């Protein structure tokens, strides 16, 4: 058994997208690994057969991570770049998605069809007709309709146009996507035989979550038409294939529908929120929308939990499965509850039941004919594929078992900080954990690092996080908690609108006090603090309000709510929602809650880590804070990652992820050891 090493990150296998075949007998999923030499990720499709436990690698091109089952139940349809001509065409700037099929019976993948747009999702209506969600942009349309002889000239013209960006709407860029002005997700029908591509939605319409009914004669989806400013609301639409009719249904003036499906032929299943009581982060409710009388009925008025998994980890890669899935009469979903993710179902009468819970994290799932498959992190194990029957989980893969067998890991010690006389600033108990250094000697004292999650509406749980375990193996105690603002404990607990840097700061400081009191091996003169996104905001805030931390690492942070409002992809709606103010309604309030205001008080040596293409918390946020600290004579450093975005720590290029970890450790070593 050896210590966990920084570059063990490059040896893990990340699993995603489990999907059971139509008969529920075979589960396909994607497996991803880092390729350090090429500085990229390799993705392949695997299948696990439930009846005889046979595990088969279906593809080996390392470029195949997204797929669907075809209705015959014997073949998978997936997008890939395999042939030299296709790779060359992509490199020249051509825009298309090439689909292949591969059979469970073996043999090579077969070319299926090509679509002249980037395809973000595909659904089979029948063997000759597919519903596509495509990324549409006017130049893509021009290219798609051009004759082969015209394409070189058009591609050259498009290449020249990359020197300019013309913007006339907000948002005009999006983290991970770059400039998005006039780009839309549109729905199309694709006829395999005629190669006809027919648009369902218009050029300025943003469509999402298309879902077929059981007869495959209709599909529902959500969307909004916009040309100047994207509003954070949408409507529900119903398309009937036979007569090509499109109906629009409004769920309410401020209603945001997250997901739509069919309870039955006359009733839509709607998941969404009115955003009236808790703003854009309000937990959604489940509804039934009657197509006959156009009425919306809330099935879960008392429910206060969010579908989806909000647990933090740096060991995920690849897309998830559909977040909500129907099987029989019920819909199934994951929900973040307390410090874990549980698997639940909702019945037509609105009854919500817990089906399964795992200590660790349930990441994604598939359910077909009562059969269940999950990607999960059980306790300190990394992701594996699990089946679930007779109230028991069973790991059916062992991609990452070597980590537990061959590396030293440290258990998570849970501590609950009580809201009592000792902690007068706490309004409620706070969940937290500490990971001891490895190896641990009770007669020694150790440096510690407080880690703060992003969101703020995400959460820490009891699952594997490489960065934490590695720092523990480097001699640090790592401690972390879920302050007010976090997910998993309902709307009221998560509501920090207009209070950033107040109650959340109090919770983090009370937690730090408790950790130092409870663990005498921690040296209070050698503790550091770090966090990313909202955690970066809190790091910036903390160093302006206390000198108790010897060093700080602020990552993809927020420094100034005014600049955040006017420059980032979500700023124009996120900032007023979270701060109850705009630069024009109350600029003083925004400045009051901006860490930059307090930069003249900072004495803590701070490393800033930022990505050049982070449009969620744009580069000027890190630069402003770094410049302010340098101006005031504080030891500081800015490490900028080219070609990376807000997801650097989770899906950045392998070499960049290692460099980020190296920068963090070396900064803390310098001041805490």
Residue map of PLM features:
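Short, solvent-exposed loop/turn segments at conserved positions within beta-propeller repeat blades
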Residues: 37-42, 85-96, 178-184, 228-234, ...
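Conserved beta-propeller blade repeats
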Residues: 12-27, 61-77, 85, 116-131, ...
